[in-house]
Curated annotation (Swiss-Prot):
Possesses an unusual extended V-shaped dimeric structure with each monomer consisting of three distinct domains arranged along a curved 'spinal' alpha-helix. The N-terminal catalytic domain specifically recognizes the glutamate moiety of the substrate. The second domain is the NADPH-binding domain, and the third C-terminal domain is responsible for dimerization. Substrate binds at T49, C50, N51, R52, S118, E123, P124, Q125, Q129. GO terms for molecular function: glutamyl-tRNA reductase activity; NADP binding. Transmembrane segments: none annotated. Keywords: NADP, Oxidoreductase, Porphyrin biosynthesis. This is Glutamyl-tRNA reductase. The gene is hemA. It comes from Actinobacillus pleuropneumoniae serotype 3 (strain JL03). Its EC number is 1.2.1.70. InterPro entries: 4pyrrol_synth_GluRdtase, 4pyrrol_synth_GluRdtase_dimer, 4pyrrol_synth_GluRdtase_N, GluRdtase_CS, GluRdtase_dimer_dom_sf, GluRdtase_N_sf, NAD(P)-bd_dom_sf, Shikm_DH/Glu-tRNA_Rdtase. The record marks H108 as: Important for activity. Homodimer.
């Protein structure tokens, strides 16, 4: 039995190549069907994000020994299929792809789900993406009146509980390490209740979208967006499914006069909010506390605005200091998280070994039972036909003993022939022959 992780990520491949191997819904469905048709795996889970594409295969028929020719051939078949479905040259792909098996594959999956392998250390979104990937796989196999193999399913369930444990036992996700989240975290330190505050966001790009999502998530209800192109701001509001007041840049003063918190991130080469504009706004607001966070480079907000009474002003440089401090905390937490992953990975493989021994014992008992029933049936026929009962029973016991000992005897002879003294000793110890 082998679990194989095959993939590429932001560490091994460019954005261009990562985009070529991404799985949309249609290609994911095709992949499931092809893998099943070609018998590449008993089950597979496909994880596809902007930073990684990884497939987790479980094949019960493949030996776990990586150097074995069957294992090597299977890996190559998986690789060739992966190149084929994405219509890529082998050479282009081979330089960027990685294979991890069994213990390393399980550890890698757990590290991925915990955010330890992410571009932004500890980012929480990846766990949801791993769960969604598992759900896609589960849905496919259910549609085929089947299910994900027990061992692969157990690995993913263990992974989810490991990620939950990492979040609860470490500080890996407690501090912001992106500019957008750091800005919002700073706002939460200064103001308590976002639901009662008025926000002015200047710009409508990716950073402002992240800021808006964070604010909404933490209860913000009153948001204005000012942008050079109002239509882009309207599109952002629609995408966030949240009513927002849209302003043009020429109406910035109107927004400032109402805002408790201003967060700005545009690509403008010119300053958009002067100290004088903030001063006018403060008079309108009766000098209630105002927070200005300027994420833009070059600046959108006059750096001297912070000299005004009740105005708190922060720049992107201030946020970078916060991020560096938080990143150091996350790196320390990541060491704790890695220890948890190792513990959980070992625990999973202990379960797997127990499961494999249980399966082996079950098959051995089934074979023995089949032999018993076959010989018993022959003995009953002989007794019914009037043969001597003592002779029939002796023959039954003799044949049963020979049948049950035939395979173990062959194994002993093979070990003796190959000079496997350790195997012979273990066999003798298991059968308690040394004590006799």
């Amino acid at each position: 039995m082998t679990i194989l992780a095959l993939g590429i990520n932001h560490k091994t491949a460019s954005v261009n190549l990562r985009s070529k191997v991404a799985f949309d819904d249609q290609k994911r469905q095709l992949a499931f069907e092809q893998i099943q048709h070609r018998a590449l795996a008993e089950s597979v889970v496909i994880l596809s994000t902007c930073n990684r594409t990884e497939l987790y295969f479980h094949n019960a028929e493949i030996t776990p020994r990586e150097e074995h020719e069957d294992n090597i051939a299977w890996r190559e078949q998986c690789f060739e299929w992966f190149a084929e479905i994405h219509q890529l040259e082998h050479n282009e792909l081979r330089e960027c792809i990685y294979f991890k098996q069994n213990m390393e594959a399980a550890r890698h999956l757990m590290r991925v789900a915990c955010g330890l392998d992410s571009l932004i250390l500890g980012e929480p979104q990846i766990l949801g993406q791993v769960k969604q990937a598992y759900q896609y796989s589960e849905n496919f196999y259910q549609s085929q009146n089947s299910h994900i193999s027990t061992k692969l399913s157990r690995l993913f369930q263990r992974t989810f509980s490991t990620a939950k444990r990492v979040r609860s036992e470490t500080e890996i996700g407690s501090s912001a390490v992106s500019v957008a989240y750091a800005a919002c975290g700073l706002a939460r330190q200064i103001f308590d209740n976002f639901g009662k505050l008025r926000f002015l966001l200047v710009g409508a790009g990716e950073t402002i979208e992240l800021v808006a999502r964070y604010l909404i998530q933490h209860g913000a209800k009153n948001i204005m967006i000012a942008n050079r192109t109002p239509q882009r701001a309207e599109t952002l509001a629609e995408r966030l499914n949240t009513p927002m007041q849209i302003l043009s840049l020429s109406a910035l003063q109107i927004g400032l006069n109402q805002a408790d918190i201003v967060i700005s991130s545009t690509g403008s080469p010119d300053m958009l909010i002067s100290k004088e504009m903030v001063e006018i706004a403060q008079k309108q607001r009766q000098f209630d506390p105002m927070l200005l966070i300027d994420i833009a480079v070059p600046r959108d907000i006059d750096e001297n605005a912070g000299e005004l009474d009740a105005v708190y002003s922060y720049s992107v440089d201030d946020l970078q200091h916060i991020i560096q401090r938080n990143m150091a905390q996350r790196e320390q937490a990541a060491e704790q998280a890695a220890q948890i992953v190792d513990e959980e990975c070992k625990a999973f493989f202990e379960w797997l070994k127990q499961q494999q021994s249980s399966d082996l014992i079950k098959r051995y008992r089934q074979d023995a039972e089949q032999t018993r029933q076959e010989l018993l049936a022959k003995a009953l026929v002989a007794l019914t036909s009037g043969q001597d009962s003592e002779k029939v029973l002796n023959e039954l016991s003799y044949k049963l003993t020979n049948s049950l000992l035939h395979v173990p005897t062959q194994a002993l002879q093979a070990m003796a022939k190959s000079g496997n003294s350790q195997g012979l000793q273990s066999f003798s110890k298991a059968l308690k022959l040394e004590e006799q």
